A protein has these predicted regions:
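Long, position-biased, composition-driven segments near the start of the mature protein
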Residues: 13-358
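Classical eukaryotic N-terminal signal peptides for Sec-dependent ER targeting/secretion
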Residues: 1-12
Length: 358
């Protein structure tokens, strides 16, 4: 996807919100709208982009594979959906923005923040004390809220669900942080350690939120009270429902549509033409079953196509110190979902078995 696309999608709505804000405080100093926008906008855009790239990875072999339409996060767009998939998009995008802001803060990209040393010197546990340079997640969380949550201008149930899932994403960044330590002592005895907290790899956050997606909770609400909009009756119904929701639990309102079939109005492309996996090294069971999930169970057949690819081969090490490779062409068998023929299949098309039941 072009960088300009996600820049517009992830920031355009926020820019307007910030321009209308009188001012907001960051680390005890005041920044007015346009200046604040320019300071953090590139990090927000990069964070939103990394979130969507992770979404595409996590759902690469699912019927819904995080298409470009999933980037439309704000509730004033024409989709207004609150499905299980939408909950993940909000969470992973929010996490991506917070993650990037936190990382860039630790790298010294912003004058307004640095390491989190608030606990330095305190005893953390047996044989170790807090010290070093912990990643400043509080800063990342605060600025992420100001940007990402500003996209949510509604006050109905869907808006509250989106804000909740935004928060789930931010909490995921905190929940996956790692403790890193450095040993101190005579002759490397490591009699005491100095430790700090650092961000996990973003893939770990994606894996964490994918589990939350699988365990997401559907909210059952009275549709008549929901249609009341921002009335006292609607707010009461929403508050009552959210009272039983855990802060780290993804929630959704509507059942997912049939992602097997194309629906242009909803931005769903269907699974026809999608690649699937049948063989290969280090494939998970989920990946090995992708042909059944994407093709067979969607009423499509698996079609094998042979594609020519160019790859490095016959690599040799030369003293000193380079590796030289040849460029080899080879035919690789790939598998795609295709429509079933109404007549007998031509001889050149190989039908594949449907795979094992899950």
């Amino acid at each position: 996807m072009k960088r300009s696309t996600f820049l517009i999608l992830s920031i355009a709505g926020v820019y307007g919100a910030i321009l209308h804000a009188a001012a907001w405080s960051v680390n005890n100093f005041l920044m007015t709208g346009p200046k604040a926008y320019l300071t953090y906008s590139s990090s927000v855009a990069a964070g939103a982009h990394s979130g969507m790239e992770e979404c595409k990875f996590q759902f690469g072999w699912e019927r819904w594979n995080c298409p470009e339409s999933a980037l439309q996060l704000s509730t004033h767009n024409r989709l207004r959906s609150a499905t299980r998939e939408t909950s993940f998009v909000h969470a992973i995008s929010s996490a991506g923005v917070m993650y990037t802001l936190t990382r860039n803060c630790s790298m010294g990209d912003f004058e307004s923040c640095g390491c989190d040393d608030s606990r330095n010197g305190r005893v953390g546990g047996r044989g170790w004390v807090w010290g070093g340079c912990s990643d400043n997640v509080e800063f990342g969380e605060r600025i992420s809220k100001l940007f990402v949550d500003a996209l949510e201008t509604g006050h109905d149930t869907r808006a509250l669900i989106n804000l909740h899932n935004n928060e789930v994403g931010r909490l995921a960044v905190k929940a996956t942080m790692k403790r890193a330590c450095k040993c101190h002592g005579v002759s490397g005895s490591c009699s005491i350690q100095t430790c700090w907290l650092q961000l996990a790899e973003f893939r770990e956050i994606g894996n964490y939120l994918k589990i939350k997606y699988d365990q997401a909770h559907k909210l059952e609400m009275d549709k008549r009270r929901m249609r009341a909009g921002n009335s006292a009756d609607s707010r009461g119904a929403t508050a009552e429902t959210f009272h039983h929701v855990h802060p780290t639990e993804l929630v959704f309102l509507e059942d997912s549509p049939d992602y097997c079939t194309r629906n242009a109005s909803l931005g769903h492309h269907g699974t026809e033409g999608r690649e699937c996996l049948q063989t290969g090294k280090n494939l998970s069971q989920w990946e090995k079953r992708s042909c059944r999930r994407l093709c067979t169970e969607c009423g499509l057949r698996v079609e094998e196509r042979r594609t020519e690819v160019v790859a490095s081969c016959n690599c040799k090490f030369h003293w000193c110190c380079t590796v030289r490779c040849e460029q080899c062409r080879q035919l690789v068998a790939k598998h795609f979902c295709a429509r079933r023929d109404t007549t007998a299949a031509p001889n050149h098309i190989k039908r594949r078995n449907k795979g094992h039941k899950r």
